[in-house]
Each structure stands twice: as C-alpha cells, then as structure tokens.
Amino acid sequence: MPIELIFNEGPNDLFVVRVAGNGLGHDVLGSLWYALEHLRESLRLVVILGHSGCGAVSAAVDAFLHPLGYLSVSTSYSLRGILDRLLIVVEAAARKLAATYGSNVVEQPGYRDALIAAAVAGNVAQVAFTVQRELAGLGLNELRAVHGVYRLETREVWVPPGTADSPTRLAHPPTDLAAFDQLGDAIAKSDLIAQNLGR
C-alpha cells in the first residue's frame, strides 16, 4: 500500500523508508539521517507505521509459539536478526495477554491473531521510542516520532485507546518503562485484541 495514499499526500510529499518488521538497522537509520540532513526545512514528523498481519511479526509469533519451527531460520543470519529483535516484543505482548485474559488465553482459537496484533502495536511503539531518543540525541527536540498500525482490513490507522495525539491522531511513543507497561495494558485491553479473541 502506498503510504502517500494512506495519509492523503502527493508523490514526494513524504520520505518513506520501508523495512521488514520496522527494524532500525544501520541502513534504516542512515536513510533517516539522510532525510534529516537534506530535508530538514520541511521535515515535521517521523511516523513509524506498522500494518496488520505483518509478515515479520507473524514469523516471530510463530517462532514463539512453535520454537522447533525456528530451527529452519536459525541458520540464516539476516532472518534470525529480524526475528530475534521481534521475539522480545512478542514475549512482552504474550505476557500482557496472559495477564489480561488469563493463562489459558493461549488455548483460544484467535490467540495467534491477537498476539500478532498486540506485537505489531508494541513493536511500532518501541521503534518510535528509539527514534525519538535518537532525535533527542541529535538535539532535534522539535521533531516528534509517532506511531500507528495500518489495518489492511479496514484501511484505517489504529492506535491504542487513549494514546492518540492531536492533530496527527497517531500515538506518542512511551517515555519510560512505566509508560511501556501502561501501553501494553491498553493494547491488551483494546477492542482490537478482544475481537481477535472472539470476545
């Protein structure tokens, strides 16, 4: 999906960097710094946008749920690097779902989809947090990083309840561990996750 269409922008109005699982490798950070260096006058916002059913997050969820399946990926350094980073977010999402719905939530038919949705939302928040810290480290405190999840099935950008920023309607990243914990609760208790679990 062209990002320009999602945000109703024209060609070249946005500087877009696409990467599996929203990973912040050297190439991605280099691309962001290029934009900061050469487009600074017009750059106002850094948006980290995940999407429902993300293939990289789905693969990490499957590795989490079925660790033996991870063995086929473990010999591929590049794929393993993506999944290893995402497994941290997946595990955090799994813990929040268990805390919210009970440990037997893993037996519910929609658990995999709920875990993917929660992990995608947590992942973009974590990446936005990291980008915001990088911007602050460069003295670019006027730039903000925000995040959201594009839902392919509804063609809308979703953010966890109570996190939307005005006027962007995207979410600010958490600022500390307590804020990450609160965000995890908001994601787990959201209608999106409840729907995936058939509640």
Identify the residue ranges that each predicted region occupies:
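Gly/Ser/Thr-rich loops at beta-strand to alpha-helix junctions
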Residues: M1, G50-V57
